[in-house]
């Protein structure tokens, strides 16, 4: 009977401990391909560390360092989201205005929800810091428990809204990629039947009247084909501009990397220039000291030998 009670007690204690531990194993369910996703992952990782409520977290919460770090990560994330959204807007091309407005509205709403979640989190941590300061040395275990529960709920909400924003941006991106193709296809679908009708009418006319009409139909067909080719060329030019823009960005990043490498080499050379004279001076002093010791030793030995002979 005692053994049974011991097993039950251990089970209850294990359940209580598991309920009190913060859930810090959640991961965002996508690859961090875009800069805004990478920035959000940095925010997410920092929040996971805050949720542990370790002694270091408690200390940094009380001196507002945590809220400052979260503010920087929030601003970085939202800046990257805005930049990515602007880039997609420029790539939409010939898309219907109502489609453009609808996609932009959906992305804007998802972006606003994610920003509100981050702001709510920062305000809650600031509130916790103020509450701890008012406790005046009393136990803050209840405050930590409430904060831990609130952080778990906010992490779930953040994950939900972040994934929703990612899906909205994916739809936006698909619209940007397919916009030009849809525009060219729509023009071809509208003009194709007209060209075919002109050919059929020309074939049905008599030999005496058909030739002028055939010539006009041919000219019309040529103009239509020229227009289609022009639209296609514009779409290709737009894609080429996008590729050139990406290449320019990559080139700038390589240039910045090279500048950082050169600065590091310059700094290394400066350090070497600073310390080499010190090392050489120490070597000279050490050599002089060794010479003095050797001279003193030789002097002592030379004076002791005659005394032994006497």
From Swiss-Prot:
Indicate whether Glycoprotein appears among the record's keywords.
yes
The record's region (Lipid-binding and lipoprotein association) falls at 202-282
> Where do the annotations place heparin binding?
154-157, 221-228
Its signal peptide is 1-18
Cited Pfam families: Apolipoprotein
Q: Where in the cell is it found?
A: Secreted; Secreted, Extracellular space; Secreted, Extracellular space, Extracellular matrix; Extracellular vesicle
Q: What does this protein do?
A: APOE is an apolipoprotein, a protein associating with lipid particles, that mainly functions in lipoprotein-mediated lipid transport between organs via the plasma and interstitial fluids. APOE is a core component of plasma lipoproteins and is involved in their production, conversion and clearance. Apolipoproteins are amphipathic molecules that interact both with lipids of the lipoprotein particle core and the aqueous environment of the plasma.
Q: What is this protein called?
A: Apolipoprotein E
Q: Which organism is it from?
A: Grammomys surdaster
Gene that specifies this protein: Apoe
């Amino acid at each position: 009977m005692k053994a049974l009670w011991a097993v039950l007690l251990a089970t209850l204690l294990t359940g209580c401990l598991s309920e009190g531990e913060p859930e810090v194993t959640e991961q965002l369910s996508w690859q961090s391909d875009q800069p805004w996703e990478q920035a959000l992952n940095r925010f997410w990782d920092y929040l996971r560390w805050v949720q542990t409520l370790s002694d270091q977290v408690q200390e940094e919460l009380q001196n507002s360092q945590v809220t400052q770090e979260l503010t920087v990560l929030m601003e970085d994330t939202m800046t990257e989201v805005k930049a990515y959204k602007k880039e997609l807007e420029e790539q939409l091309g010939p898309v219907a205005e109502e489609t453009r407005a609808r996609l932009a509205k959906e992305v804007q709403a998802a972006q606003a929800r994610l920003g509100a979640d981050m702001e709510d989190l920062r305000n809650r941590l600031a509130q916790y810091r103020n509450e701890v300061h008012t406790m005046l040395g009393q136990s803050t275990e209840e405050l930590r428990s409430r904060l831990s529960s609130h952080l778990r709920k906010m992490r779930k909400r953040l994950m939900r809204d972040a994934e929703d924003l990612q899906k909205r941006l994916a739809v936006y991106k698909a619209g940007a990629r397919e916009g030009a193709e849809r525009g060219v296809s729509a023009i071809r679908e509208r003009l194709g039947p007209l060209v075919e009708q002109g050919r059929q009418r020309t074939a049905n006319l008599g030999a005496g009247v058909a030739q002028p009409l055939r010539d006009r139909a041919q000219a019309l067909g040529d103009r239509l084909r020229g227009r289609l080719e022009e639209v296609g060329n514009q779409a290709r030019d737009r894609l080429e501009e996008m590729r050139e823009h990406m290449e320019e960005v990559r080139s700038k990043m390589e240039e910045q990397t090279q500048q950082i490498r050169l600065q590091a080499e310059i700094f290394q050379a400066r350090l070497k220039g600073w310390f080499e004279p010190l090392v050489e001076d120490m070597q000279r002093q050490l050599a002089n000291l060794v010479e003095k010791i050797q001279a003193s030793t030789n002097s002592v030995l030379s004076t002791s030998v005659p005394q032994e002979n006497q």
